[in-house]
């Protein structure tokens, strides 16, 4: 699977990637491969992802690519890898809220926002780590271990920035769903 270069992920914003996908200058599979490569490289240090859905995401990216080639365009998120905060239900995929008692919880249906992302053609790449049950601001209290700050490892990632800095800003993904 050909991957977008990590350098391109570092400098190109979501609008640029979207336009390149829409005009078929870049494929959703290439973008996904670049994101998965980045996750593999840096997630062991950052612990931003609880679950990575490589196989499912590849199937979604391949389907998005086929749709785009036939002229079906769902909108600006079509083919874009999106991470989901582990607080939001994803059908058939563990949703734990980073809480030990929910470690094996698998919902039967998607949260409304997740369903809307899928309808828009977004590629769900994985579930991101968070403070247990969303009850704190540090990101240190997760059943899956603390989330680390990509810019300054000696500092906490902190609250909302947990997901934003550790997945989107370090360019694991181009977009993140969660508050």
Role assignments for model-derived ranges:
Residues 54-77, 103, 107, 117, ...:
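Flexible, acidic active-site loops/lids enriched in D/E/S/T/G that coordinate Mg2+ and/or position polar
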Residues 109-179:
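Short glycine/serine-rich loop segments
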Residues 1-56:
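An N-terminal boundary/leader segment
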Residues 17-21, 61-64, 164:
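Generic hydrophobic alpha-helical segments
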Residues 26-27, 73, 173:
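Conserved hydrophobic residue
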Residues 14, 76-113, 140:
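Enzymes and membrane/adaptor proteins characterized by extended Gly/Ser/Thr/Asp/Glu-rich
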Residues 65-88, 122, 127-129:
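Glycine-rich, aromatic-flanked loop segments that form ligand/cofactor-binding clefts
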């Amino acid at each position: 699977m050909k991957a977008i270069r990590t350098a391109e992920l570092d400098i190109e914003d979501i609008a640029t990637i979207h336009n390149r996908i829409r005009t078929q200058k870049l494929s959703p599979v290439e973008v996904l491969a670049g994101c998965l490569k980045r996750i593999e490289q840096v997630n062991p240090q950052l612990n931003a992802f609880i679950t990575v859905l490589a196989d499912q995401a590849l199937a979604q990216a391949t389907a998005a690519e086929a749709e785009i080639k036939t002229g079906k365009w769902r909108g600006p998120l079509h083919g874009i890898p999106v991470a989901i905060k582990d607080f939001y239900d994803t059908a058939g995929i563990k949703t734990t809220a980073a809480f030990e008692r929910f470690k094996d919880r698998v919902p039967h249906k998607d949260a409304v926002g997740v369903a809307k992302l899928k309808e828009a053609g977004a590629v769900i790449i994985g579930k991101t780590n968070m403070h247990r049950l969303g009850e704190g601001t540090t990101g240190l209290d997760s059943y899956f271990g603390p989330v680390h700050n990509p810019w300054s490892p000696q500092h906490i990632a902190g609250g909302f920035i947990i997901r934003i800095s550790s997945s989107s800003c370090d360019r694991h993904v181009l977009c993140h769903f969660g508050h």
